[in-house]
């Protein structure tokens, strides 16, 4: 039921809300190579090798949809410690709610997204999920940051503690 569409969004897979059956709709799709390149630019990644989504859209509350499932992505990142490139695999669980604008205004749930023009974009949902799961300070597995200044016992390199007088016991 989702179909590729040319738009400003790097990874678009629109789904018409009124076409989703009562028992739900299974949506399995992957990003094309060009879409991976565009998403890598969007996320400032050296490379995004693949993105695959396994989603289930089910009717929810008066014309809305609940989307659950998982997203997998193979990416390359740059370590903030060694500045070396490394590959990693992301697996993200998805649970998102979409409501018509009229119901969304009256809804108590703050985490629901609006349904626009009778459709939702599963590709954008996947892109947002990846963006939220990306590590802001990626490190290669097993890599640690060792700063000798932090481990030094030299009092000249450490600023005086505001609690130094309290901690003194005479």
Give the ranges of each region predicted by the language model.
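A positional/architectural concept
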Residues: 1-72
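Charge-rich, low-complexity linker and terminal segments
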Residues: 1-22, 26, 50, 97-170
